[in-house]
Amino acid sequence: MEILNNKTLPELAWLLLGPLVLFYVFKLFIYNVYFHPLRKFPGPWINKISIIPHLYTVFQGKQSYELLKLHRKYGHIVRYGPNELSFSSARAWKDIYGSRPGHQTFVKGTWYDGLSIFAAQDVRSIITERDPTKHAAIARVFGGAFSRSFLNEMEPMINDYIDRFIEHVKTKTANGGVVDLTFGYSSMTFDIIGDLAFGQDFGAIGRETTHPFILELNESLTFTSFHEAIQQFPALGPIARFFFREKVNKLEETARKGGEFALQVMRKRVAEQDTTSRKDFLTKVLEQRASSKVQMSEIQLAAQSWDFIGAGTETTASVMTSTTYYLLRDKKLLAELTAEIRAAFPNADAITNASTEKLELLHRVCLEGLRLPTGAPPILPRLVPKGGDTVDGHFIPGGTPVTIAPMVAALDPLNFKDPLEFKPERWLGKSGDILEASQPFSYGTRGCAGKAIALMEVRVTIAKMLYTFDMELENPDLDWTGNDFNNLLQFGLWVRPLLNVRARLATK
């Protein structure tokens, strides 16, 4: 008793609770490692006990990078949390995201609940809606916006923005100047998708500073990345908010402003519907809305357009930037592709979506640019249906969150030989690589609806850049990606370093 009398209240609390905490951790360790339904799947023992080590990589922006290291060590299947599994095989893409006769759908997990900018109002988009029936209803409304015929209608507008960007590069690089293509490509894709999503020219191309909307978008993606992580471990939420309260408050405020701006721009677009001849993603939707064939509020429309921008701006810009970097690092490949492009076209106006589809080397370069590294989000979680199902030949209990990290599958040495090397020739199909493992647009009915638009932007932009300019890196020794891409951070999407380039007008 004398020992207890000499203790302070906190010391007594620890003395009494400490053994209970240690017993709980020990019990958790024994159960999760030896008796849990996922006990047979490999992974670090600490991850089997708690999701916290994985969440730490999310907060660092290193989620894909750390998952890749785990897959290199453990193979195609990794248990990265007590209840979570990550896969990296081509077969897993089909099993998780595809449609299999006799199998139920693997619906999107709760991870997506934090992605919506209007989650507080319980408004979901074509990307964040988890319910298959509700998603199908949204997809029917916007289906025509991603058709080939719509893309053909929008091509002149898209090409106009690409040509504006080319002129901007000419101005920036005149007299030996340099242009940061990380910033430049981001501004261009933002203007393109912004016009398609909101019917408005935001004027990002040519700005010396980042457009405020892009800043709000990126900050919002950072916030949703934080929110997604917290959702996987709700008890951590109050603790994380306390220690990172200043950062969290700033991110929340920026996300709120982003939502307000999106709604403001949407209201302007709706008001102009009867007086504008411009076409965009919303044209048909607003026509049907006016005739009461579609019931969708302004905030629901804003949620769709916001997510179109989030999914179609930095993703596509990432692919353009990494592809340009790898081309400028490989003079032989750069010369071959430049020769193919300049031989194919009499002038820059002849460079179109249809004409670039015919260029075989350009096609392979773009596929490799999409693989290394992919512009996709870090993970794409789904829930195994009730009763369980098989993934990659293994039975997985129902309710288990399963995912493929697109970057991991694309860089897994079990799928690709020399996975960190930029080798467009692998897409000839003769290297023995498992090409189906690279799915930068995801897979199945919930894959990226804007795939055709993104591919067009990448092909036409790269072709026009190489047709117009002879380019070189400002720093020939630039290691833009870093070891295993650890120079590139992921907070929802990629955060990329500068890519400063010198460009001279080509003489043909």
UniProtKB/Swiss-Prot annotation:
Pathway: Sesquiterpene biosynthesis
Cellular compartments annotated: Membrane
UniProt key word Transmembrane helix: yes
Cofactor or coenzyme needed: heme
Membrane topology: Single-pass membrane protein
One GO cellular component term: membrane
Documented EC number(s): 1.-.-.-
Pfam family, one: p450
Residues where heme binds: 448
Main location: membrane
InterPro entries in UniProt: Cyt_P450 (IPR001128), Cyt_P450_CS (IPR017972), Cyt_P450_E_grp-I (IPR002401), Cyt_P450_sf (IPR036396), Cytochrome_P450_monoxygenase (IPR050121)
PROSITE patterns with a match to the protein in the record: CYTOCHROME_P450
One GO MF term attached to the UniProt entry: monooxygenase activity
Gene3D superfamilies associated with the record: Cytochrome P450
This protein's UniProt keywords: Heme, Iron, Membrane, Metal-binding, Monooxygenase, Oxidoreductase, Transmembrane, Transmembrane helix
Membrane-crossing segments per the record: 11-31
PANTHER family cross-referenced by the UniProt entry: CYTOCHROME P450 (PTHR24305), P450, PUTATIVE (EUROFUNG)-RELATED (PTHR24305:SF161)
Homology family: Belongs to the cytochrome P450 family.
Function in brief: Cytochrome P450 monooxygenase; part of the minimal biosynthetic bip cluster that mediates the biosynthesis of bridged polycyclic sesquiterpenoids derived from sativene, isosativene, and longifolene. The sesquiterpene cyclase BipA acts as a versatile cyclase that converts farnesyl diphosphate (FPP) into (-)-sativene as the dominant product and (-)-isosativene and (-)-longifolene as minor ones.
Protein name: Cytochrome P450 monooxygenase BipB
Organism: Cochliobolus sativus (Common root rot and spot blotch fungus)
